[in-house]
Amino acid sequence: MIHLLALLMLVAGVQDTTLAVIPRPVHVTRGTGTFLLTPATVVVTDRATRQIGYQLADWLGPATGYRLPVSGAPGTAARTISLRIDPTLARLGEEGYRLTVTGTRITIRAFRPAGVFYGVETLRQLLPPDAFRQAPVPGVTWTVHAVEIEDMPRFQWRGAHLDVSRSFMPKEFVKKYIDLLALHKLNRFHWHLTDDQGWRIEIKKYPLLTAIGAWRRNSLVGVQRGYADTTQWVYDNVPHGGFYTQDDVREVVAYAQARFITVVPEIEMPGHAQAAIAAYPWLGNTGQQLEVLAHWGVDQNILNPSDSAIHFMQDVLTEVLALFPSRWIHTGGDEAPKAQWQTSPVAQARIRELGLHSENELQSWLTAQMSQWLAGRGRSLIGWDEILEGGMEGLAPNAVVMSWRGIDGGIAAAQAGHDVVMTPTSNTYFDYYQSQDLAKEPLAIGGFLPLETVYAYEPVPPALDSVQAKHVLGTQGQIWTEYQRNPKNVEFMVFPRLVALAEVAWTPAERKDFADFTSRLRRHVARLDVLDVNYRKLN
């Protein structure tokens, strides 16, 4: 129904390439005249949109110097910006909106507040780029061309990931990242909080997770020759670490909620767990005292499948659930080598006890236990596609698969009735190089992912029929931070590729056009400049 409506909007609309709005709206009709924003303009809201009205006034205030009043009625104002819930717009869904600009009024209406918020984000892009500045800009006429836009997203999951384990990122940057997601109408922030190289979230029941697990001696910064020869690895000899307190997490979650973004935490299990094992050696399989890992790649140390380790995972998730209202809780599940389980008396006893036939089946059993535990608390487990390797038996029906090793995992999960988020390395891994001229590129993990390849991505595999395709929730961009050591490095790798993926996730496939996108992008980067985003310059 959503796709049919989008097509009807496209047929009925007038194609417009003069507005540099990203993602490209479904339907745009240009009018005549302009709306002039003045100090006397009133932001008019109803009760459901009041906070969005305050946000809009706060966002416009620094650059314009105007303190726009927010009111439930226009009074005698000659020019108004009206934000309203409209029950007749149910056909636009939870996040769609209608924006109308005339000479005297800007009206944003939607079925739900999220739609009003996205209409506001579009309005901000209709203003001059200087509207994003945080200080008064003299001499600017704050005008918006007359237009009517009717818009709605193609996918419900429009995400961006951030790995803060390999390289810890300050809380203020995390909030800036969330602002940039909101600007591009992305609604899922996947926060990768734990891994071999660092545990980044305070868990009160297990204080050593951050006292020990959040810190490492140094970091791998390069390889002189072949990666397989560890004698050629180069370290920086600089201690690295950090973590977010539970108050920090609450602050970030509230900040995202105000921007209609769901924060999806990732707590890795059973692999990528060396930081946890370094803090509590009884979680491992060897009993050895480990250090937090300082190099990259797949590590052999994984959590053991004992009752005590399972209770640990549940204890951690109990505190995580109290911090994150997200329906989805990511438990990783990727890159969990089974060599230690093959020689572990505990793991082998568990396999015999359950009548399993392999270590992969043991991981699937463990994932099923966690998915059912989460389902019993009203949440859905989401994991990387390796969670399918031992079969889907026992996996809670509401469990979601994130397909990163190509699209086959997503296809298999969707065909089995599970929701999926499509995240293949080929189109969504922003830690890959942006050019094949590596001498001009900062160090990256490898690969090659140019902007055009991101934009060309189609998240719904042709192998799925119309019923199975409904299980594709959407797509998401990933940034792993092995070599992205600071916020500016992250921004360089993510932007503008995330801008392209935002359009993939929002705009109907038949409305996409790379030449048109790049034309709008060349004007859109003026906004990124104002926002001090260290994006890769366009060719």
Summary of predicted features, one role per range:
Residues M1-L7:
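Sec-dependent signal peptide recognition
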Residues V14-W157, Q478, N489, R497, ...:
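Contiguous, structured surface segment used for ligand recognition
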Residues Q51-I52, F168-P170, D196-E202, P270-A276, ...:
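Flexible loop/turn segments at secondary-structure boundaries
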Residues A90-Q314, T318-W328, Q369, W373, ...:
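Feature activates predominantly on carbohydrate-active enzymes
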Residues A276-W282, T286, L290-A399, W404-A416:
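Active-site neighborhood of glycoside hydrolase catalytic domains
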Residues S380-L388, E393-A399, S403-N539:
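Flexible, acidic glycine-rich loops studded with aromatic residues
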